[in-house]
Design a protein with these regions (language model features):
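Gram-negative outer-membrane beta-barrel transporters
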Residues: 616, 620-627, 638-755, 787-788, ...
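Outer-membrane beta-barrel domain signature, strongest for Gram-negative TonB-dependent receptors
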Residues: 239-436, 443, 618
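Short acidic/polar hinge/loop motifs at secondary-structure boundaries
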Residues: 113, 128-153
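Repeated loop/turn-to-beta-strand initiation elements of outer-membrane beta-barrel proteins
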Residues: 213-216, 252-257, 385-388, 428-433, ...
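Structural signature of Gram-negative outer-membrane beta-barrels, strongest in the C-terminal barrel
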Residues: 432-444, 449-451, 486-627, 644-645, ...
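N-terminal Sec signal peptide and the immediately downstream disordered periplasmic leader
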Residues: 1-87, 93-100, 808, 820
């Protein structure tokens, strides 16, 4: 374990010491902590003033067993609906202040999923895995009762998953705590307005119902948004509908069903192009126009027009045109001074101070997504604690993404899963023992197309906007010349088993295993693809279609021990399989033929948790190492082959009924194992990479590309993820209905890309809110980025990090008015 984490001794001791110091406050309270979990009449306790932030309720989304966060031998945090309301949390980026181990690079400005432990995370809905969402649409959070953030790969019971972790969204229930229906309907309506023409209205209602003699509970949610944006050419229009229903069919059989629909219309945001250190530090931008290529006068440049000017396109690989090689250092001015590469030269070159509003988003760009999620659970209760649950789940999206600089894609994909969970519990003098067996089948159908071979960020001068010299004719516009156009499906047949042995002397052991057998089929639609790409695929031995199958084992073993003074040390070791799918849940024929569409990761984690002061104070610290087992298999966009080492610490303290304080610390180092093994990583070259080209205007009409040398482990560090991140939140509620809250995150400086050529500054971002509640009315004002800090977020660091960066939002205001009934 000593070489597992390479931290300074001082920071490790401080993290553990902070946790141990809690015991000094709580020794007298620990003896009664276990007894205080319920009152004498069996009712659940409620810690007033905690906003549901304390880990006193069962969370089944980690192992499937109803354990509290304190009892769970994994690093996990929960964010309640009350926390989200009080702190004005509106998107997944706001969750970083509430949970350690989380931070997100920009995936073209769309909040699809958090980076967890430095790699893209996944989204679960009621414990069922949704389709991949790296940046297909902003994940809605407003209808959630709770969000669980689990760091590290999922338990075997949940199936193949990514290395970093996942967020599980728990929708608002049709029942109250304890399982009964509400006595009468209740609900609320909220209107929100704010900076940059923010306009949003949402309504929710919960209550009991009856059809004939059949009683049921319901929870309904609707949200409509029509907002502008700080950035030029951007807006958000979306409708979200969600419903949950619950009824007892018989005394032993319960039905839970519902779903969510989201219709989102917006845009991606590539941020600033022509990236230099001077642009980041001082806002100094290189201006200039690309040479015209639009020979037919239709106002756009087509692939044919590009190839007519520069055969093979304007993405020039390496310095071979001037006697160089594959690395950026071999490229000189001479590569771009003669035909045909001189077509990359800019004209009318100068400099200007660039507004942070001016980004790569064009007037005609669009990101449209229609998503549907459905579920139906049948739960049968047998003798004792025997339970059989049948879970049906459906998730789909129909997505189109168009960007004027030269990237487009679409997805039309869905997944259907049916899982049976058979569980039972036993208790005797030795302890409590719980078991689960779960067969399941999941079918995924995909249709995906993309267009990225002619992606030229720098042709557009952001001070001017798109012109016929920079606006590309996209494959989704002509329905032609795609880089990939692939259809297919895959089915996962699986069986999983879990067991929990909670011994009465304090030891708790959880073990589990799963076997997945995947059958896959995929085929390119050759007629829709660019002929040159088809020829290149075939020359590389990539088949036009393929089918195949592969099996994969997953397992986990965890243990914790209840020590005196409220301390619970734990350890976990696990191996989890993962399916290497793309941005639209697609598999490619080459991966199926090569048996490389399934890989696995291993996790080693140890930590210390505790809960004191009648469960008013919770603290945890963990260290971990997790890595992919196959270094040569990765999706560079959504499922990288990485090794991550880190430390996570957090505390949550409900001081009294007025004051709640939380804090977190994250230390993360992520290494790209594929790059480290190969010694190189393919990348777009930025201005700061091309150190031997004296004038960047020589090539900004196109895109030099090549290989970044990876000669050491430090070279393989994933860019954009800070080594150290600190967070602190506090909220105080007065007796007269007034409440104040604030949150802050302190983030280390990071490199924007894998080549480590441009450094983004460290920053501290503070958000604050004030609310007043009287009778049925609640008014709230939220100020985000209170100090108006200028900061940046790295964008797709492995590929584009040296070429583009996203300038983040300045200070903004949101005001909302809620009526509760």
């Amino acid at each position: 374990m000593r070489d597992m984490i390479r931290f300074t001794a001082r920071k490790t001791v401080l993290a553990a010491g902070a946790l141990l110091c809690c015991t000094a406050l709580t020794t007298p309270a620990f003896a009664q902590a276990a007894a205080d979990e319920t009152t004498e009449d069996g009712k659940d306790i409620v810690v007033t003033g905690s906003l549901g932030a304390l880990p006193i309720e069962g969370v089944g989304t980690v192992f499937g067993f109803d354990k509290t966060v304190t009892e769970t031998p994994r690093s996990v945090s929960t964010i309640s609906a009350e926390q989200m309301e009080r702190f004005g949390i509106t998107d997944i980026y706001d969750l970083v202040a509430q949970s350690p181990g989380t931070f997100t690079n920009s995936f073209f400005g769309v909040g699809g999923a958090l980076d967890i432990r430095g790699t893209p995370g996944e989204i679960y809905f009621r414990g069922m895995r949704r389709l991949d969402n790296p940046g297909n649409y902003p994940t809605p959070i407003g209808a959630s009762e709770r969000i669980d953030i689990v760091r590290g790969p999922a338990s075997p019971i949940y199936g193949p998953s990514k290395t970093g972790g996942y967020m599980n969204f728990v929708p608002k229930s049709a029942r109250v705590q304890g399982g009964s229906y509400l006595a009468s309907p209740e609900g609320e309506v909220t209107m929100t307005g704010g900076s940059w023409r923010k306009a949003d209205i949402k309504a929710e209602m919960r209550g009991p119902g009856k059809i004939g003699t059949q009683e049921f509970g319901y929870s309904l949610f609707a949200e409509v948004e029509d907002s502008g944006s700080y950035y030029d050419n951007m807006s958000t229009r979306q409708t979200i509908l969600q419903g949950s229903f619950d009824t007892d069919l018989t005394p032993n059989l319960r039905l839970e069903f519902g779903g969510m629909y989201q219709n989102y219309k917006g845009q991606q945001n590539g941020g600033w192009n022509r990236l230099t250190q001077d642009l980041v530090d001082n806002g100094t931008y290189i201006t200039g126009s690309a040479k015209p290529l639009d020979t037919n006068g239709d106002g756009q440049i087509s692939q044919g027009e590009i190839n007519a000017a520069v055969p093979g396109g304007m993405s020039i690989f390496g310095g071979f045109a001037c006697g160089g090689g594959v690395f950026a250092s071999s490229i000189t001015d001479a590569c771009f001074t003669s035909s045909p590469n001189s077509a990359l030269n800019l004209t009318n070159v100068g400099t200007a101070k660039l507004s942070r509003r001016k980004t790569l988003t064009g007037k005609n760009d669009r990101l449209d997504n229609k998503g549907s999620t459905l579920y139906a659970d049948l739960i049968w209760k047998g003798a004792g604690d025997l339970e059989i649950k049948n879970q049906f789940f459906f998730d789909s999206y129909d997505n189109i993404n168009e960007n004027s600089y030269g990237f487009s894609q679409f997805h039309d994909s869905y997944a259907i899963e049916n899982k049976v969970v058979i569980s039972d519990k036993f208790e005797n003098d030795i302890g409590k023992f719980a078991f689960q067996v779960s067969p399941s089948i999941r079918y995924t159908n995909f249709k995906h197309g993309d267009d990225f071979n002619y992606e030229y960020f720098h042709r557009v001068d952001l001070t001017v906007g798109y012109t016929p010299a920079s606006d590309r004719l996209l494959s989704t516009e002509c329905d032609c010349d795609y880089t990939n156009y692939v259809t297919g499906h895959y089915t996962d047949y699986s069986i999983a088993a879990l067991a929990d042995f909670d011994f009465s002397f304090g030891l708790d052991v959880t073990v589990g295993a799963r076997y997945d057998y995947l059958k896959a089929k995929s085929a390119y639609n050759i007629g829709k693809m660019e002929a040159a790409q088809v020829a290149s695929n075939r020359a590389d031995g990539i088949p036009d279609s393929a089918s195949g199958n592969k099996g994969a084992w997953s397992w986990s073993a965890s243990a914790n021990y209840k020590l005196p003074y409220g301390l619970i040390p734990y350890a976990t070791i696990a191996r989890q399989s993962t399916v290497i799918a793309g941005q639209g849940a697609e598999l490619y024929p080459g991966d199926i033929a090569g048996q490389t569409f399934v890989s696995a990761s291993k996790l080693y984690e140890g930590g210390l948790k505790g809960s004191w002061l009648d469960d008013r104070l919770y603290a945890a610290v963990s260290i971990y190492k997790q890595k992919r087992t196959d270094y040569n298999i990765q999706s560079v966009t959504v499922n990288q082959s990485v090794e991550t080492k880190g430390l996570e610490a957090e505390f949550r303290w409900s001081v009294d009924k007025h004051l709640l304080i939380t804090g977190g610390y994250t230390r993360t180092k992520v290494y790209n194992l594929t790059a480290l093994t190969n010694g190189t990583l393919f990348s777009f070259f930025g201005i700061e990479d091309l150190v031997n080209v004296s004038d960047p205007s020589l090539y900004l009409g196109g895109q030099p590309i090549g290989l970044v040398p990876i000669t050491s482990k430090s070279d393989s560090r994933r860019a954009g993820i800070p080594t150290n991140l600190y967070s602190l939140t506090a909220t105080y509620a007065f007796d007269n209905g007034l409440a104040l809250s604030a949150s802050g995150v302190k983030v280390d400086s990071v490199y924007s890309g894998q080549s480590q050529a441009v450094k983004l500054p460290a920053y501290t971002k503070i958000d604050a809110a004030i609310s007043y509640e009287t009778g049925p009315w609640l008014a709230r004002l939220v100020v985000k980025n209170v100090t108006d800090k200028k900061y940046f977020r790295a964008n797709f660091t492995e590929l584009f990090g040296s070429t583009i960066v996203l300038p983040e939002l300045p200070r903004s205001f949101q005001a909302s008015l809620t009526y509760k009934f």
